[in-house]
Amino acid sequence: MNDENLANSSDVPSIPGKYLRVLALAGVAALGLALGTASAQTIVDEWANVKTPPAPELKPVTIDSKTTALLMLDFMIHNCGKRPRCIASLPAVKKFLDEARAKGMLVVYATVPKGNIADTLKEVAPTGSEPIVSSGPDKFINTDLEKILKDKGIKSVITIGTAAHGAVLFTASAAGLRGWNVIVPVDGMSSDPYTEQYTAWHLANAPVLSARVTLTRFDLVKF
């Protein structure tokens, strides 16, 4: 029997078309899996090659001192002392705090859990009449902060403090997601440079939150 006859012989089993299609699809899937495995990268793998996004815009802000509260977050000696930018920012923070008080703005202080308000840096220490709450990074959790703000008819909050990636990020986010307008002077939040950078980027770009947050500087804020 020659090759042609062999090819036409009924002794050679045929493969139904549907099975051929299944085999073809399986082959494509296997190839895709192999290529995907070879090229898959995580953000950690690509870390060194990620390009820094453009800096967010700092905007001028005019505030109503009657409906705006200044949140002074974790300006504790042990927090600020280990962050050089926090120490360097104190004169500007004090000047802004003095201006806010002079305009009759509500000022609320926050400390870390079990923190002692007496450990607040003396340059920016609270007066006897200013409310104080104590919590972790999100100062709304297990505190009266939300009630304090609502009872005073507050519509906007200014969040400053240390650390930028701790109390400022979490409290600003919590305020925005609760419906308050949030103003963040970037020269009033402190940590190390990278964490300040990603905090500013997150606040300016996060879904929902970005519509509530305005990044600014102390000198761009008008009372």
Q: Where are the regions a protein language model picked out?
A:
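Short hydrophobic beta-strand that contains or immediately precedes a catalytic carboxylate
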Residues: 71-73
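Active-site-adjacent betaalpha module
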Residues: 2, 40-69, 114-223
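Von Willebrand factor
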Residues: 97-115
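…and closely analogous acidic/polar surface helices at protein-protein or active-site interfaces
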Residues: 83-100
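Bacterial N-terminal signal peptides
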Residues: 23-34
